[in-house]
């Protein structure tokens, strides 16, 4: 199973890149994590709806075929790390890759939210989209470690 992360935004600060890389490199090949940065739309003279629509089209192009789509959204379902581990086991058993979608500064277009198989919330608080990458990568690693009885998770 591959874990794809499509994240709107590029030119992230080094601490974001390092944080994401720290956890993505810990993942074994059987649950490889791959980040694809989606270029954000330029704001000049455009309304939010236009920006989100343009980013939505880029996301659709980048979506791996046949994947299970999980949108990260503050209004999504709250899940504990143990629940995320259960979900990962289910996804792995389904034989499909999983794609997590993180919106940019303005969020995600409703069309992307509608094609999602699931909506999850990392927090009910609004998070900077760069930080969401790091938090997601850490939680995926932690959830995977639970499925393998690895001592990283000690709850």
Curated annotation (Swiss-Prot):
<comment type="function">
    <text>Specifically methylates the pseudouridine at position 1915 (m3Psi1915) in 23S rRNA.</text>
</comment>
<comment type="similarity">
    <text>Belongs to the RNA methyltransferase RlmH family.</text>
</comment>
<keyword id="KW-0808">Transferase</keyword>
<dbReference type="GO" id="GO:0005737">
    <property type="term" value="C:cytoplasm"/>
</dbReference>
<keyword id="KW-0698">rRNA processing</keyword>
<keyword id="KW-0489">Methyltransferase</keyword>
<dbReference type="InterPro" id="IPR003742">
    <property type="entry name" value="RlmH-like"/>
</dbReference>
<dbReference type="InterPro" id="IPR029026">
    <property type="entry name" value="tRNA_m1G_MTases_N"/>
</dbReference>
<dbReference type="Pfam" id="PF02590">
    <property type="entry name" value="SPOUT_MTase"/>
</dbReference>
<feature type="binding site">
    <location>
        <position position="103"/>
    </location>
    <ligand>
        <name>S-adenosyl-L-methionine</name>
    </ligand>
</feature>
<keyword id="KW-0963">Cytoplasm</keyword>
<comment type="subunit">
    <text>Homodimer.</text>
</comment>
<dbReference type="GO" id="GO:0070038">
    <property type="term" value="F:rRNA (pseudouridine-N3-)-methyltransferase activity"/>
</dbReference>
<keyword id="KW-0949">S-adenosyl-L-methionine</keyword>
<feature type="binding site">
    <location>
        <position position="72"/>
    </location>
    <ligand>
        <name>S-adenosyl-L-methionine</name>
    </ligand>
</feature>
<feature type="binding site">
    <location>
        <begin position="122"/>
        <end position="127"/>
    </location>
    <ligand>
        <name>S-adenosyl-L-methionine</name>
    </ligand>
</feature>
<dbReference type="InterPro" id="IPR029028">
    <property type="entry name" value="Alpha/beta_knot_MTases"/>
</dbReference>
<protein>
    <recommendedName>
        <fullName>Ribosomal RNA large subunit methyltransferase H</fullName>
        <ecNumber>2.1.1.177</ecNumber>
    </recommendedName>
</protein>
């Amino acid at each position: 199973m591959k874990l794809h992360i499509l994240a709107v935004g590029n030119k992230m600060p080094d601490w974001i890149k390092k944080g994401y890389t720290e956890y993505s490199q810990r993942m074994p090949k059987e649950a490889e994590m791959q980040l694809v940065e989606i270029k954000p739309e330029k704001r000049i003279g455009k309304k939010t709806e236009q920006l989100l629509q343009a980013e939505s089209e880029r996301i659709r192009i980048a979506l791996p075929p046949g994947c299970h789509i999980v949108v990260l959204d503050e209004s999504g379902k709250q899940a504990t790390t143990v629940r995320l581990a259960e979900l990962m086991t289910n996804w792995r058993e389904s034989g499909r890759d999983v794609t997590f979608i993180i919106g940019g500064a303005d969020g995600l277009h409703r069309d992307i939210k509608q094609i999602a198989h699931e909506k999850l919330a990392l927090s009910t608080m609004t998070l900077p989209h760069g930080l969401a990458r790091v938090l997601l990568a850490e939680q995926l690693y932690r959830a995977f470690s639970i499925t393998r009885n690895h001592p990283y998770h000690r709850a």
